[in-house]
Protein backbone atom coordinates (compact mmCIF):
# COMPACT_ATOMS: atom_id res chain seq x y z
CA UNK A 1 0.00 0.00 0.00
CA UNK A 2 2.79 2.39 0.90
CA UNK A 3 4.52 1.52 -2.39
CA UNK A 4 1.33 2.32 -4.34
CA UNK A 5 0.95 5.66 -2.58
CA UNK A 6 4.59 6.47 -3.31
CA UNK A 7 4.17 5.66 -7.00
CA UNK A 8 1.00 7.76 -7.19
CA UNK A 9 2.83 10.64 -5.56
CA UNK A 10 5.70 10.30 -8.04
CA UNK A 11 3.26 10.17 -10.95
CA UNK A 12 1.65 13.38 -9.74
CA UNK A 13 5.02 15.11 -9.61
CA UNK A 14 5.81 13.84 -13.12
CA UNK A 15 2.61 15.37 -14.48
CA UNK A 16 3.51 18.61 -12.71
CA UNK A 17 6.97 18.64 -14.30
CA UNK A 18 5.56 18.05 -17.79
CA UNK A 19 3.10 20.88 -17.21
CA UNK A 20 5.96 23.15 -16.17
CA UNK A 21 7.90 22.20 -19.28
CA UNK A 22 4.92 22.95 -21.53
CA UNK A 23 4.50 26.37 -19.95
CA UNK A 24 8.17 27.28 -20.23
CA UNK A 25 7.88 28.69 -23.73
CA UNK A 26 4.94 30.91 -22.74
CA UNK A 27 6.78 32.21 -19.68
CA UNK A 28 9.89 32.97 -21.72
CA UNK A 29 7.78 34.87 -24.25
CA UNK A 30 6.37 36.96 -21.40
CA UNK A 31 9.88 37.52 -20.05
CA UNK A 32 11.03 38.71 -23.47
CA UNK A 33 8.16 41.21 -23.64
CA UNK A 34 8.99 42.42 -20.13
CA UNK A 35 12.60 42.98 -21.12
CA UNK A 36 11.54 45.18 -24.02
CA UNK A 37 9.27 47.27 -21.77
CA UNK A 38 11.94 47.67 -19.07
CA UNK A 39 14.70 48.62 -21.50
CA UNK A 40 12.52 51.11 -23.38
CA UNK A 41 11.41 52.61 -20.06
CA UNK A 42 15.01 52.90 -18.82
CA UNK A 43 16.08 54.70 -21.97
CA UNK A 44 13.03 56.99 -22.04
CA UNK A 45 13.39 57.98 -18.39
CA UNK A 46 17.17 58.21 -18.59
CA UNK A 47 17.49 55.91 -15.60
CA UNK A 48 21.09 55.02 -14.76
CA UNK A 49 20.81 52.07 -12.42
CA UNK A 50 22.47 49.65 -14.77
CA UNK A 51 25.46 49.06 -12.49
CA UNK A 52 23.13 47.92 -9.71
CA UNK A 53 21.43 45.60 -12.19
CA UNK A 54 24.83 44.21 -13.18
CA UNK A 55 25.58 43.42 -9.52
CA UNK A 56 22.19 41.70 -9.19
CA UNK A 57 22.97 39.68 -12.34
CA UNK A 58 26.27 38.46 -10.87
CA UNK A 59 24.59 37.63 -7.54
CA UNK A 60 21.78 35.76 -9.32
CA UNK A 61 24.16 33.70 -11.47
CA UNK A 62 26.35 32.79 -8.51
CA UNK A 63 23.48 32.02 -6.13
CA UNK A 64 21.81 29.75 -8.67
CA UNK A 65 24.97 27.82 -9.49
CA UNK A 66 26.09 27.39 -5.88
CA UNK A 67 22.59 26.29 -4.91
CA UNK A 68 22.52 23.69 -7.68
CA UNK A 69 25.84 22.23 -6.55
CA UNK A 70 24.43 21.06 -3.20
CA UNK A 71 21.16 19.53 -4.44
CA UNK A 72 20.48 15.80 -4.63
CA UNK A 73 17.28 15.96 -6.66
CA UNK A 74 17.44 16.55 -10.42
CA UNK A 75 14.36 18.85 -10.58
CA UNK A 76 15.89 20.96 -7.80
CA UNK A 77 19.19 21.15 -9.67
CA UNK A 78 17.33 22.29 -12.77
CA UNK A 79 15.35 24.84 -10.74
CA UNK A 80 18.52 26.43 -9.32
CA UNK A 81 20.02 26.29 -12.78
CA UNK A 82 17.09 28.40 -14.00
CA UNK A 83 17.98 31.03 -11.42
CA UNK A 84 21.51 31.14 -12.81
CA UNK A 85 20.19 31.37 -16.37
CA UNK A 86 18.05 34.34 -15.35
CA UNK A 87 21.26 36.01 -14.22
CA UNK A 88 22.78 35.56 -17.68
CA UNK A 89 19.67 37.10 -19.23
CA UNK A 90 19.96 40.07 -16.86
CA UNK A 91 23.36 40.83 -18.39
CA UNK A 92 21.50 42.00 -21.47
CA UNK A 93 19.26 44.23 -19.35
CA UNK A 94 22.22 45.82 -17.60
CA UNK A 95 24.05 46.52 -20.85
CA UNK A 96 21.09 47.24 -23.15
CA UNK A 97 21.31 51.07 -22.87
CA UNK A 98 24.90 50.84 -24.13
CA UNK A 99 24.66 48.01 -26.66
CA UNK A 100 22.05 46.65 -29.07
CA UNK A 101 24.03 43.42 -29.03
CA UNK A 102 23.24 42.97 -25.34
CA UNK A 103 19.48 43.11 -25.82
CA UNK A 104 19.73 40.79 -28.82
CA UNK A 105 21.74 38.35 -26.70
CA UNK A 106 19.14 38.36 -23.92
CA UNK A 107 16.26 37.69 -26.28
CA UNK A 108 18.29 34.98 -28.04
CA UNK A 109 19.13 33.32 -24.72
CA UNK A 110 15.51 33.47 -23.55
CA UNK A 111 14.44 31.55 -26.65
CA UNK A 112 17.26 29.02 -26.32
CA UNK A 113 16.68 28.56 -22.61
CA UNK A 114 12.99 27.80 -23.18
CA UNK A 115 13.97 24.85 -25.39
CA UNK A 116 16.95 23.68 -23.32
CA UNK A 117 15.21 23.73 -19.96
CA UNK A 118 11.92 22.31 -21.26
CA UNK A 119 13.81 19.36 -22.75
CA UNK A 120 15.73 18.86 -19.51
CA UNK A 121 12.53 18.78 -17.42
CA UNK A 122 10.85 16.41 -19.87
CA UNK A 123 13.86 14.09 -19.67
CA UNK A 124 13.69 14.20 -15.87
CA UNK A 125 9.97 13.43 -16.05
CA UNK A 126 10.68 10.48 -18.37
CA UNK A 127 13.18 9.08 -15.87
CA UNK A 128 10.76 9.59 -12.98
CA UNK A 129 7.99 7.87 -14.94
CA UNK A 130 10.16 4.85 -15.74
CA UNK A 131 12.11 4.60 -12.49
CA UNK A 132 9.68 6.17 -9.98
CA UNK A 133 11.99 8.75 -8.48
CA UNK A 134 13.82 12.04 -8.80
CA UNK A 135 16.96 11.32 -6.79
CA UNK A 136 20.35 11.48 -8.49
CA UNK A 137 20.80 7.85 -7.50
CA UNK A 138 18.10 6.93 -10.03
CA UNK A 139 20.43 8.18 -12.77
CA UNK A 140 23.16 5.60 -12.12
CA UNK A 141 23.73 3.70 -15.35
CA UNK A 142 20.96 5.58 -17.16
CA UNK A 143 23.06 5.63 -20.33
CA UNK A 144 22.52 1.87 -20.58
CA UNK A 145 19.02 1.64 -19.12
CA UNK A 146 17.42 4.55 -21.05
CA UNK A 147 19.95 5.45 -23.76
CA UNK A 148 17.81 7.85 -25.84
CA UNK A 149 16.66 9.77 -22.78
CA UNK A 150 20.22 9.90 -21.45
CA UNK A 151 21.59 11.27 -24.74
CA UNK A 152 18.86 13.90 -25.05
CA UNK A 153 19.30 14.90 -21.40
CA UNK A 154 23.06 15.14 -21.80
CA UNK A 155 22.72 17.42 -24.83
CA UNK A 156 20.31 19.61 -22.86
CA UNK A 157 22.76 19.88 -19.97
CA UNK A 158 25.70 20.67 -22.23
CA UNK A 159 23.63 23.30 -24.03
CA UNK A 160 22.67 24.89 -20.71
CA UNK A 161 26.34 24.98 -19.76
CA UNK A 162 27.13 26.78 -23.00
CA UNK A 163 29.30 24.08 -24.54
CA UNK A 164 29.97 24.67 -28.27
CA UNK A 165 28.57 24.12 -30.81
CA UNK A 166 25.16 23.82 -29.09
CA UNK A 167 22.65 26.66 -29.13
CA UNK A 168 23.32 27.75 -25.54
CA UNK A 169 26.90 28.56 -26.47
CA UNK A 170 25.93 31.03 -29.18
CA UNK A 171 23.48 33.07 -27.13
CA UNK A 172 25.95 33.22 -24.25
CA UNK A 173 28.67 34.25 -26.69
CA UNK A 174 26.54 37.19 -27.84
CA UNK A 175 25.86 38.22 -24.22
CA UNK A 176 29.45 37.87 -23.05
CA UNK A 177 30.71 39.61 -26.17
CA UNK A 178 28.43 42.55 -25.40
CA UNK A 179 30.11 42.88 -22.01
CA UNK A 180 33.56 42.96 -23.57
CA UNK A 181 32.54 45.34 -26.35
CA UNK A 182 31.05 47.91 -23.95
CA UNK A 183 34.32 48.25 -22.05
CA UNK A 184 35.02 51.67 -23.53
CA UNK A 185 31.58 52.94 -22.47
CA UNK A 186 31.13 51.34 -19.05
CA UNK A 187 34.17 50.17 -17.11
CA UNK A 188 32.33 47.25 -15.51
CA UNK A 189 31.17 45.65 -18.78
CA UNK A 190 34.20 43.36 -19.21
CA UNK A 191 34.10 42.38 -15.52
CA UNK A 192 30.46 41.39 -15.91
CA UNK A 193 31.43 39.21 -18.87
CA UNK A 194 34.26 37.59 -16.87
CA UNK A 195 31.89 36.84 -13.98
CA UNK A 196 29.47 35.23 -16.42
CA UNK A 197 32.20 33.07 -17.97
CA UNK A 198 33.33 31.90 -14.52
CA UNK A 199 29.75 31.05 -13.58
CA UNK A 200 29.32 29.06 -16.79
CA UNK A 201 32.41 27.08 -15.86
CA UNK A 202 30.99 26.56 -12.36
CA UNK A 203 27.75 25.21 -13.80
CA UNK A 204 29.69 22.48 -15.58
CA UNK A 205 30.34 21.01 -12.14
CA UNK A 206 26.77 19.91 -11.48
CA UNK A 207 25.92 19.18 -15.11
CA UNK A 208 28.96 16.89 -15.34
CA UNK A 209 27.95 15.33 -12.00
CA UNK A 210 24.62 14.21 -13.48
CA UNK A 211 26.32 12.92 -16.63
CA UNK A 212 28.85 11.01 -14.55
CA UNK A 213 25.97 9.23 -12.81
CA UNK A 214 24.44 8.32 -16.16
CA UNK A 215 27.55 7.03 -17.91
CA UNK A 216 30.26 6.20 -15.39
CA UNK A 217 28.37 4.66 -12.48
CA UNK A 218 26.22 1.55 -12.17
CA UNK A 219 23.09 1.02 -10.14
CA UNK A 220 21.87 -2.12 -8.41
CA UNK A 221 19.59 -2.80 -11.39
CA UNK A 222 21.07 -2.26 -14.88
CA UNK A 223 18.25 -3.82 -16.92
CA UNK A 224 16.85 -1.88 -19.89
CA UNK A 225 13.74 0.19 -19.20
CA UNK A 226 11.00 1.07 -21.67
CA UNK A 227 11.25 4.76 -22.49
CA UNK A 228 7.99 6.78 -22.73
CA UNK A 229 7.37 7.20 -26.47
CA UNK A 230 5.56 10.53 -26.28
CA UNK A 231 8.36 12.08 -24.25
CA UNK A 232 11.03 10.58 -26.50
CA UNK A 233 9.46 12.21 -29.56
CA UNK A 234 9.60 15.63 -27.91
CA UNK A 235 13.15 15.07 -26.68
CA UNK A 236 14.39 14.08 -30.13
CA UNK A 237 12.80 17.19 -31.65
CA UNK A 238 14.40 19.41 -29.00
CA UNK A 239 17.73 17.67 -29.50
CA UNK A 240 17.65 18.40 -33.24
CA UNK A 241 16.71 22.02 -32.53
CA UNK A 242 19.58 22.52 -30.08
CA UNK A 243 22.12 21.15 -32.53
CA UNK A 244 20.58 22.68 -35.64
CA UNK A 245 20.13 26.09 -34.04
CA UNK A 246 23.90 26.34 -33.67
CA UNK A 247 24.22 26.58 -37.44
CA UNK A 248 21.57 29.27 -37.95
Region locations from a protein language model:
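Hydrophobic transmembrane alpha-helices and their helix-loop junctions in integral membrane proteins
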Residues: 1-173, 177-203
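Cytoplasmic/organellar membrane-interface segments at the starts of transmembrane helices
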Residues: 14, 136-137, 143-150, 204-245
